[in-house]
UniProtKB/Swiss-Prot annotation:
To E.coli YrdD. One of its GO terms (biological process) is DNA topological change. It holds the Pfam family Zn_ribbon_Top1. The lineage of its organism: Bacteria, Pseudomonadati, Pseudomonadota, Gammaproteobacteria, Pasteurellales. One of its GO terms (cellular component) is chromosome. One of its GO terms (molecular function) is DNA topoisomerase type I (single strand cut, ATP-independent) activity. This is Uncharacterized protein HI_0656.1. It comes from Haemophilus influenzae (strain ATCC 51907 / DSM 11121 / KW20 / Rd).
Amino acid sequence: MNQSLFHHSKQQEYCPQCGAPLQIKQGKKGLFLGCSAYPECDYLRPLQRSEHKVLKTLDEICPKCGNLLQLKQGSFGMFIGCSHYPECDFVVREESESEEKITCPECKTGHLISRRGRQGKIFYGCDNFPKCKFSLPAKPYSVPCPTCHFPLSLLKSEDGEKQIFQCANKTCRHIFEQ
């Protein structure tokens, strides 16, 4: 059997820190290039994946680095980001002015904002992350719990004028009507 079938034809890359060959490795966040001399050399670089398809280059300037912004199609839908990604990771965030800003009950200085997790699921977390790790699985409401007086609740169901809430305090989880 022809041995060339078992070798890739792409040119070998070498570690910029120690000169050893780079290897494709699997991590919890996907594939990356890592130094074959690990653990003596800890160089690694994420593999460039074409997961963001550029739909249009815009006339807007990136406020972080000064390059042009682009409309891109990602795995969670369309978004506007910097044309110099991954060097610049600026992404335009949608901010709805109509929503009230809810203060984080844990750190008292941050506000809870909508975020998207690794699997694309939306959750609400403190904008002081990573200093404050408070998060909720659904949209919080400023409805205090009648049992423990925690300031936030999650809307469980809505039926006409009747609303069922659940306390957002992980140690309480009391369900009540409003």
